[in-house]
């Protein structure tokens, strides 16, 4: 988007949902458990941006040349200057989850988690309502858009954990598919169910660690367990 903004002279604001600006306090979001000190924390962002820019270069080089633009060198950091102005950065993260790093510049802002305040227009499946009303509050287990090489094996592990706990569960398979053992204390969601409607009715929330799901669980005030697959999810698990 920087290249498009540069070509057309359009001001741009950068938004982020997990840390992408180097600082002393936390390493890059994909490696939050490496506690190697301030030097590593800052260097991890340089390495991350170097890899991102290397991948971007494959398709941006031709596009920029076709549009009469120079190809910038790989420099291992974000582009803060564009069209003679400093690009503002807005983080959609609560300072209760990530205190603002002292080393961030004045152009970096933290707005808190973003939430659509449009009144929900949602009618739950009567079977879901009946399940929720039939006993104690269940635990939510969800996978979002995550998939693994063998979701049947993953769901076998989940089924074993559900049986061992004896808890009631609302399960959202997400995009993963896979087969789940037929358990009487489990309701499998079908179709779209808003987290902001569902989570307040849960006992706890167990999920993959997407930024949006994490925010929804925290807004609902529920105990949250993140079992990450990759990307920024280890960061949320570490918080």
What kind of feature is each model-predicted range?
Residues 15, 92-93, 111, 142, ...:
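Generic beta-strand/beta-sheet core signal
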Residues 30-33, 187-189, 225:
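Short, hinge-like loop/turn segments at secondary-structure boundaries
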Residues 140, 144, 159, 170, ...:
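Generic hydrophobic alpha-helical scaffold/packing signal
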Residues 166, 173-195, 201:
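Nucleotide-activated donor-binding/catalytic signature segment of Leloir-type glycosyltransferases, i.e.
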């Amino acid at each position: 988007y920087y290249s498009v903004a540069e070509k057309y002279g359009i001001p741009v604001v950068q938004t982020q949902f997990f840390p992408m600006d180097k600082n002393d306090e936390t390493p890059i979001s994909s490696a939050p458990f490496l506690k190697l000190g301030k030097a590593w924390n800052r260097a991890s962002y340089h390495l991350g941006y170097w890899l991102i820019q290397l991948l971007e270069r494959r398709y941006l080089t031709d596009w920029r040349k076709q549009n009469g633009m120079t190809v910038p060198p790989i420099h291992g950091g974000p582009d803060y200057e564009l069209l003679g102005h400093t690009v503002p950065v807005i983080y959609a993260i609560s300072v209760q989850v990530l205190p603002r790093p002292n080393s961030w510049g004045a152009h970096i802002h933290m707005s808190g988690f973003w939430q659509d305040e449009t009144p929900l227009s949602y009618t739950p499946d009567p079977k879901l309502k009946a399940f929720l009303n039939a006993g104690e509050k269940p635990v939510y287990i969800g996978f979002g858009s995550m998939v693994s090489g063998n979701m049947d094996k993953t769901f076998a592990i989940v089924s074993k954990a559900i049986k061992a706990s004896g808890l009631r569960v609302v399960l959202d398979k997400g995009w993963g598919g896979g087969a789940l053992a037929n358990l009487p204390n489990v309701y499998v969601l079908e179709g779209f169910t808003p987290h902001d409607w569902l989570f307040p009715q849960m006992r706890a929330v167990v999920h993959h660690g997407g930024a949006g799901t994490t925010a929804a669980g925290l807004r609902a005030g529920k105990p949250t367990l993140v079992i990450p697959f990759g990307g920024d999810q280890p960061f949320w698990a570490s918080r």
